Amino acid sequence: MESTAPCICKDSNCTKIGPPGYSGILGDKSVEFLRDPAVFVEKYCEHHNSRVFLTRLFMKQTLVIADHKLLTKFLSHSHEHFYNGLQDFSDLFGHNIMFARAEEAANLKRILLPLFGANAVESYQTVLRDVLDDWSRNLDLNNSVNLYEEFKNISLAYNIHIFMGVKKADDEEFFRSIKELSSAHWHGVTSVPWNFSIPFFGNGGYKKAMGAKKKLLKIIVERLSSANSSFFEEFRRKNDGEISQELLYNHMLLFSCALIPKGVGSVLAMFFEMGNKWKHLLSSDGKLSEDDLDCVLLEVIRMFPPFMGGTKVASEDTSVGDYHVPAGTAVYYSFMAAMRDHSAFLYPEEFMPGRWKKVEERKKNLGFGTGLHGCIGRHLTWNCIKEIINYTMDMFTIQFPDKCPPEVKILPVLRPKEPHGFTMIKKYG
């Protein structure tokens, strides 16, 4: 049903229609949104009979996009007229490619992409194998295993080795310290971005996160000056003086923090939680072919993207699809909703890995984002995820949960609400 709402540009002479919905000051729906973003988006898509609608979130007029075609176009063409809606949290990570405007982001991407390319990823294989060998040797199989936590730790150990040049097996205390600080830093993402405490309420999560950030940066600077991080040396060499020292270290913070491990842990946990849905694809020796593994992973990410979506804010009067969008308007886009859009996916609520058999269809998966601010480390992350799966299935017999999918928590990263305790038996020795 086509919207009959007036255009939100407020120009009395404008003949365009506006998106369905209401964004009045008294209609803020932040509490309802935070309760369950996925349910919120689908509820109002159904209410307005539209995959694009207007609402008010966090005291800001917000256009919500759950339409796959429009979202793909928006992510590919919005960088000139929008800035990252998490700009208020930029102090938490320092200025980096996530918050950079178009020209700077393009330059940073040019420098960074080769560091995460196929050749670079290949050189990190030995590092990941060492981390996995150390993990399997020390894994307690007498009790059920929380794979979400295990895979987060594996990813963090891998990142610390690559980006800081420190082996977890050689310095367990250092790993524990980074893990603790990364956790405190990460929790700032779900806190109000105020760097102060409120009387009687103690220290705010954001203040603690900022403290953790300072400690992490100090450790990163100290370690990179003494440890052998080939990644950092290559990063410093390739930028040819175009990037300041502060910006270099801000990116090393981004790569070393909990963001990547939580995303990796999310995908891997949901992959194994959904085991009963794809175990029929296993060969007689308990393996997935590379193509089947790709298809299953793409379907896991389609249904359960680790990061549900994002927000951009219009820096000037512009348009999104058929709608005018005034400066200051937020655009919230939902990867989860867009990848369950009936106009883009047949039976979107069904787990169907076969939908990804055609390689040309795979570009429809938005789990890593797309456009200028799409994930620069997608090749490294994809390779890491597949290697961990293959290693785990080679080394262990795993009993999958009878019931799937599990209930999930979505914010700040998707993961099982009650992670299944996996029974794992070593195949060798």
Would you name each region that the model predicts?
Residues 80, 333-359:
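Conserved cytochrome P450 K-helix/beta-meander segment immediately N-terminal to the heme-binding cysteine loop
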